[in-house]
Amino acid sequence: MYKLDLAPDPKELAAIEARRNREKERQCRFFNVRNRVMGVDVEALNYQVEERKFREAIERSKDMAYGAKHAHYDLVAQMLEKEEAERACRLSKRVQDFREQRQQFKNGHEFDFWDPDHVQEFQVPYYENEAYFGPASMQYFLGEDLERASHLRMQQEQLRYNLEKQLQEQQAAREEEARAALLSDQLRLAADTRAAELARLEESCRAAMRTAMANANKAQAAKQALLQRREQQQQQEANLAEIKKQVTSDLLTENPQVAQRPSAPHRVLPYCWKGMTAEQRAAIRKTQENQRQEKKEQRQAEKLVEAEWGSQSKRLAEAALELEEQERELCAEFRRGLGSFNRELAKEQHAQQNYLNSVIYTNQPTSHYYLQFNTSSR
């Protein structure tokens, strides 16, 4: 068959590859979101990036300020808790000291009734010689308190002192609680004031950022519209030039000379070729007819070869069948000979066994035969 897949021109391949690369670059510029530069305000985008970084830095500084404030408030709260714990510890220690010093069991009102040595502390107030008194003239009786009035005065003074001391401690505790509450209120007020100030600053920063972003978006929109109008105008001009070029090109005018190559007259340009001439078509048909004849002769030769191979295969199969028949006959004859040999051998073995049983193994050993063994210790 006539072959038309001729080697292409290197210059043509280079031009096609250059156009393909330019188209890929153009598509990359238009469709790559990260690296696109046509139709986008790069300066505005960079400004937005810087603005976002500045906003993130402000937020980080605010977070750091909040963290510092929280740390300060936590420290103050820990100090207040520590002071409250110390105050409670001091108060409990004072109460315990008071109980140990002023509220002993021996100083209680009921101690006089339960003290077994209370009577022995008092002596006879008038006379020490018991010889002058009889049994009916006793001066001191069990349970009698001669200094009851002085004891009552002392107890009242002690009670008044304890009450005054408790009142002073309660007043000091109330004043301490009032100071702690005042300090806590001041801290909360300072925290609320600081939070309100930070909220106001944050709102002002947000308003400024919104204003700047709106202005940047307006400028970007205006620049984008201008670039779109310019691009549309350039696209229209390029389309008109392309239409004019196609109308006046050799493709639409069907110029047969453009398909010829000066350096290789036997080769044509595929994209400019308009068809073959009558002589070329006749030559192709003649070549095809010759190829058909050659193919027919080749098929006939292949059929002869296949017939020869078939007859040879048939002969080989018949020879194999004959060999198999001979092998089966030899195997049958061998099995017959082997059977007769086995029968003769069985007869001989049977006769040998009868001879052994009837002649050799007839004399059975007696007990006297076994007594001749193991008669010595060695």
Curated annotation (Swiss-Prot):
Q: Which GO terms describe its biological process?
A: flagellated sperm motility
Under InterPro entries, the record lists: RIB43A
Q: Which residues form a coiled coil?
A: 153-250, 279-334
Report the main location listed first in the record.
cytoplasm
Q: Which of UniProt's keywords are assigned here?
A: Cell projection, Cilium, Coiled coil, Cytoplasm, Cytoskeleton, Flagellum
Q: Where in the cell is it found?
A: Cytoplasm, Cytoskeleton, Flagellum axoneme
Say yes or no: keyword DNA-binding present.
no
Assembly description: Microtubule inner protein component of sperm flagellar doublet microtubules.
Which family is this protein grouped under? Answer: Belongs to the RIB43A family.
Q: What is this protein called?
A: RIB43A-like with coiled-coils protein 1
Recite the lineage of the species. Eukaryota, Metazoa, Chordata, Craniata, Vertebrata
Gene this protein is translated from: Ribc1
